[in-house]
Amino acid sequence: MAPEEDSLALAEAWNHGFGFIKTSIVKTAVELEIPDILESRGAPVSIPELATAVDCSADRIYRVMRFLAYHGIFKRTKPPPESTEGGSVYYAQTPVSRRLTRENLGPFVLLQGTMREPSGCVTAETLRTSKRPGVVNENESDHLYEDPVFSMKVFRDAMASHARMTTAAVIENYGEGFQGVGSLVDVGGSYGMALSMLVKAFPWLRGICFDLPEVVARASPLKGVEFVGGTMFESIPKADVVMLMFVLHNWSDEECVEILKRCKDAVSKDKGKVIIIDAVIDEDGDGDEFTGARLGLDVTMMATMFEGRERTYVEWARIINEAGFRRHVVKNIKTLESVIEAYP
């Protein structure tokens, strides 16, 4: 190996050694609401001003911002002409940091550090035993989810953030898929946030949010959304279209086939369809700019769910065909997930 190649390899190895720091510091910036502060100011902010806003040491905030600017999260800029702090360092938003505000993916980033213990990481034990580290009984719930702050705030906000971003992409890039659709069932729709966004964007839809009885019992009324309790392994309310958003990646292939069969029973054979919104991994690992995130999500599912996984085109085709659908189409919606249309 040439000296230059060896030096690059060593640098890359060091970067992996400190790889966890990037996510940790991004999470810290979100906790301090730095992206929101910069967004609200609408102009570059000096380190002293930022330190005052977040009630932290200016030196420490500078070092954090220097690190994040190196990684392209924020950008260092020149002082604005009207500045009275000529010697201060200024930082501004980037397209990435705008995606880290509270109204974007900020809440999802806040989830990450909390899931490292006991069962949020892929470890040697995970790979050898197919069990989550720190969880003794497969039927035992993760103690993390028993924490009301985590389950009712951190986890719920993260899932809502993810669903909000993906639903916005569906509305923007898959609007034609809802033309001529009268009724739509959102299976596993929780409290109906995603469905309410779709009904607002496509007001001709009659939305049915279908989830476990104990979930829909806690849901607040939403315009254009009817809540129905039940289990997707038994039966699903009939509609023109059945939607599964972030559902099938939680389950084994066998369970997915059973869920899809129930979905198939709920739609018309002539005009109905099932919409699956989940990640589709490219066979050769290339793909688009979201491939790294999809692969990351897949190994996260391996750590947090016993049978959860993201699937390739071939793997999706296998379970869709086995469930009895005659054809399916995969559509790119310019985000982490794709839309898969399955026709009975």
Curated annotation (Swiss-Prot):
Gene3D superfamilies linked to this entry: Vaccinia Virus protein VP39, Winged helix-like DNA-binding domain superfamily/Winged helix DNA-binding domain
Question: SUPFAM superfamilies from the xrefs?
Answer: S-adenosyl-L-methionine-dependent methyltransferases, Winged helix' DNA-binding domain
The kind of enzyme this is, by top-level EC class, is: transferase
Q: Which residues are S-adenosyl-L-methionine-binding?
A: 211
- TM region(s), chain numbering: none
Q: List UniProt keywords, sorted A-Z.
A: Methyltransferase, S-adenosyl-L-methionine, Transferase
Tell me which EC number(s) this protein carries: 2.1.1.-, 2.1.1.232
Annotated InterPro entries:
COMT-like, O_MeTrfase_dom, Plant_O-MeTrfase_dimerisation, SAM-dependent_MTases_sf, WH-like_DNA-bd_sf, WH_DNA-bd_sf
Q: Biological process GO annotation list?
A: methylation
Q: Report the domain of life of the source organism.
A: Eukaryota
GO molecular function, a single term: O-methyltransferase activity
Q: Which reaction does it catalyse?
A: apigenin + S-adenosyl-L-methionine = genkwanin + S-adenosyl-L-homocysteine + H(+); luteolin + S-adenosyl-L-methionine = luteolin 7-methyl ether + S-adenosyl-L-homocysteine + H(+); quercetin + S-adenosyl-L-methionine = rhamnetin + S-adenosyl-L-homocysteine + H(+); (2S)-naringenin + S-adenosyl-L-methionine = (2S)-sakuranetin + S-adenosyl-L-homocysteine + H(+)
Pathway note: Flavonoid metabolism
Similarity comment: family membership: Belongs to the class I-like SAM-binding methyltransferase superfamily. Cation-independent O-methyltransferase family.
Q: Its quaternary structure?
A: Homodimer.
Protein name from the UniProt record: Flavonoid 7-O-methyltransferase 1A
What high-level taxonomic lineage is stated for the organism?
Eukaryota, Viridiplantae, Streptophyta, Embryophyta, Tracheophyta
